[in-house]
Amino acid sequence: MIRLLNCKWNELNEKLTNKKLYCFGSGSQAEWLSYEICQVHLAEKISAFIDNNFNKQGTFVELDGIKIPVISFNNFVKQRNNGTVILITSMYYSDMLEQMDREPLLDGVECYIEVFLEEPIEKAYFNVAHNEVEKIPKKIHYCWFGKQDIPQQYLEYLKSWERFCPDYEIIRWDENNYDYDKVSYTSQAYRAGKWAFVSDYARLDIIYTYGGIYLDVDVEVVRNLDPLLKNQMFCGFEKGNLINTGLGFGAEKGFGLLRDMREMYKNVLFINSDGTLNLTPCTKFQTDFLESRGLKRNGKQQLIDGIRVYPRTVLAPYDFFQVSNQFSDMTFTAHHYAATWFGRKNNKRSLVQKNHEIIQRMREK
């Protein structure tokens, strides 16, 4: 079996001294990780990316100006030696572990999984001056498209909004009061039954038009949100140093940069020309947009043209994979990641169980 290990991101480079690193997975997860890989100077230590997708084999991944080849799993097995280390850079890490465990030539090879690498809790700062004007109105908006009942678990999260923010107006948006045909992207997503993608645009449009705070229904509020209202706009990092407005974000009515973020979707179609669905997550659009305005994907608090970007601990202490916890005295909301876009045959409960088994293997070393 593979030898599973874990460490902090900033310790990984040191552990690779005199070793050759192979990254398993060259897809979107690896693309999003490019910033972290370059930050800790790992690019020059990567011998190759491994990918099971035949169409990617023989291509290259460019990181920090270095072109890194993509090879097949079988070629990797032939290349491996006593100094080989694997870093799984895919959200399908469980399947990849099973594949490697079945290969006897990989017995004892050191392996790390990116989503399990530990990250420090970054400090957050809030304007607590009593004379500071609250720019964002006391409104909490949420979307529920699809005409189905809201599951009981989510209703419990909604109760937390009322408990900690009793003087806020809570507004539901659905087919009855929101025009999902406003842009082609949402119109196509709605007819494809992809409600989460409808919300990706709708929440930007709603907050720009009315002002307030948006929360996904799988977000639990853990303290009063008033300190966040003193921003013109706020949003937050999630694991991987990506921006996700589904975690919870807010803005004053008519905020200019939010309008620009919304307008991006007018040039995007949900159904591609070949009939396939454009499942690019909102994190890609929103992170790219803010990077073009000067965002640094370092997980630290920053102010970009009136947008306050908070570290992960503020709005997303948990991650989708439920393998890390950055809950702190700076946490306002906790996103529990229903991830309805995650169309896999294995449900999330099964994934969480596998994660616990992986953590146990790491502890056993």
Label the predicted regions:
Residues 26:
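Glycine-rich Rossmann-fold phosphate-binding loop(s) that bind the pyrophosphate
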Residues 61-66:
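Short, conserved SAM-binding/catalytic segment
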Residues 71-82, 184:
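Short amphipathic alpha-helix with an adjacent loop that forms part of the alpha/beta core around
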Residues 2-20, 31-32, 36, 41, ...:
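Glycosyltransferase-associated regions of secretory-pathway enzymes
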Residues 200-212:
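Small-residue hinge/turn detector
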Residues 49:
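Active-site region of the double-stranded beta-helix
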Residues 23, 214:
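Short glycine-aspartate micro-motif
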